[in-house]
Curated annotation (Swiss-Prot):
Record localization: Secreted
Keywords on record: Hormone, Secreted
Role description: Glucagon plays a key role in glucose metabolism and homeostasis. Regulates blood glucose by increasing gluconeogenesis and decreasing glycolysis.
Source species of the chain: Huso dauricus (Kaluga sturgeon)
Predominant localisation class: secreted
Cystine residue pairs: none
Name used for this protein in its record: Glucagon-3
Example of a GO MF term: hormone activity
Induction: Produced in the A cells of the islets of Langerhans in response to a drop in blood sugar concentration.
Amino acid sequence: HSQGMFTNDFSKYLEEEHAKEFVEWLKNGKS
């Protein structure tokens, strides 16, 4: 169970990081 929870938290972390990068990319692309 702890392995699954770790994977779930990690995937959430990756999604958040990817979202930040995407926002920065959009800002740089639009300006």
